[in-house]
């Protein structure tokens, strides 16, 4: 792992609740565009690693979808609070990785935390319906269930807001999520995934991997 300051490091893949190296052992350089300094080396996942992430996410889905909406809401709110606590670290990542001015990066952190907080409340409002039937002795009940594993592909220009929008919405609905950031901005998304782990998201409910787009689609 390459250290970037005292609190920051480039991590590896996150599968089944653990940070692990890519099976190929390959890495790529994460570079500061302003100074061309190497910030660290991120693990480059293989298609086989993605299959492992999918398997873990399927297992995580079975656990997470059975977690009550109120408990999911509590965890999402904790993530929002933790993001605000770590505002400086998250903002610094964006400034180093993609050159966003620090004040703008801090604003993005606040916006991303607000998204988690919003979805924490929406989790409690996943209501079903009772519909009148055309038969006198029948009622129609509608229940909403998680659809499965979410693939969250995150662009480089707003890495924290857009990853938060996808991760928090998927988790709120009871789905598990595999997040893949742009290769330019892995660090800030890694930090968000680590916050999810710290705040009680169970293994497999959130996974993280790097892979180039043409490899991901195959």
Regions picked out by a protein language model, each given a short descriptive name:
Residues 128-212:
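Rossmann-like NAD(P) dinucleotide-binding subdomain of oxidoreductase/dehydrogenase enzymes
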Residues 3-12, 209-216:
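Conserved small/polar residues in nucleotide/adenosyl-binding loops
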Residues 1, 13, 21, 95, ...:
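Short glycine- and Lys/Arg-enriched binding-loop motifs that mark or flank ligand-binding interfaces
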Residues 37-127, 137:
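Glycine-rich loop-to-alpha-helix module at the N-terminal edge of alpha/beta enzyme cores
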Residues 6-7, 11-41, 74, 78, ...:
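Terminal low-complexity tails and localization/encapsulation signals of metabolic enzymes
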Residues 29-32, 41-52, 200-207:
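Histidine- and aromatic-rich ligand-binding microenvironments
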Residues 69-72, 180, 215:
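Short, cationic motifs built from Arg/Lys/His that form the positively charged side of catalytic pockets
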